[in-house]
C-alpha cells in the first residue's frame, strides 16, 4: 500500500476510534458514571494526540484533513450506536389509554414492570394514566407490550435525573 494511502486510512480509523470513545465518554458523564468516564478519557486523549499529530505532520495532503473530518462524523455515529446498545439508565414511560381499562395496569405488572395508575380526563372522556419506570434497554419491549394491549394508547418517555424509592422488580419477563 502506498504510504500516502496508509496515512489517510490510519487517520480515518484512529479518528473514528477517538470520537467513538469521546461520544461514549460524554454520554457516560451525563449518566453519572464518573469513574468510567474518567478512565475512558485517558484512552481518548492518547488516541486524540496520535490522530492530531498524524494530521498536523501531513497537512500538505487535503485527503488527510478530509479523512480526519469524515472519521470524526463516523465516530459520532458509531459512539451513539454503541450507547444505544448499552442503553444505560432508566426511562419513565407515561401512557394515556384510549379507554379506561382497570385491567391494563395488572397486565403490565404481570410482565414484570412497576406501574402507577390513576384516572385521567381526556377530551373524549375518562382515560387511564400510567407511569412506568424501567431500564432503557427494556423501552422497545415495553412499547410493544403496551401497543399489543392498547393499540390506541398515547405513549411518551423521558429520562429521570434522580430516582428514590418505589417498586422494583428483579427482571422484566420476556
UniProtKB/Swiss-Prot annotation:
Keywords: Cell membrane, Membrane, Transmembrane, Transmembrane helix. InterPro entries: DUF2179, DUF5698, UPF0316. It is a multi-pass membrane protein. It comes from the Bacteria. The chain crosses the membrane at residues 4-24, 36-56, 62-82. One of its GO terms (cellular component) is plasma membrane. It holds the Pfam family DUF2179. Belongs to the UPF0316 family. This is UPF0316 protein lmo1776.
Amino acid at each position: 500500500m502506498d504510504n500516502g494511502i496508509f496515512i489517510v486510512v490510519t487517520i480515518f480509523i484512529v479518528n473514528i476510534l477517538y470520537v467513538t470513545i469521546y461520544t461514549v465518554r460524554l454520554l457516560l458523564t451525563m449518566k453519572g458514571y464518573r469513574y468510567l468516564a474518567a478512565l475512558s478519557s485517558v484512552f481518548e486523549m492518547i488516541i486524540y494526540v496520535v490522530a492530531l499529530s498524524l494530521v498536523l505532520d501531513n497537512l500538505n495532503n487535503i485527503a488527510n484533513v478530509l479523512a480526519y473530518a469524515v472519521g470524526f462524523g463516523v465516530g459520532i455515529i458509531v459512539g451513539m450506536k454503541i450507547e444505544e446498545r448499552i442503553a444505560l439508565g432508566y426511562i419513565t414511560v407515561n401512557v394515556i389509554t384510549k379507554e379506561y381499562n382497570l385491567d391494563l395496569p395488572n397486565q403490565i405488572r404481570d410482565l414484570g414492570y412497576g406501574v402507577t395508575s390513576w384516572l385521567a380526563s381526556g377530551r373524549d372522556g375518562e382515560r387511564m394514566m400510567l407511569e412506568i419506570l424501567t431500564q432503557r434497554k427494556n423501552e422497545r419491549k415495553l412499547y410493544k407490550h403496551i401497543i399489543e394491549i392498547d393499540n390506541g394508547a398515547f405513549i411518551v418517555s423521558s429520562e429521570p435525573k434522580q430516582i428514590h424509592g418505589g417498586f422494583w422488580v428483579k427482571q422484566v419477563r420476556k
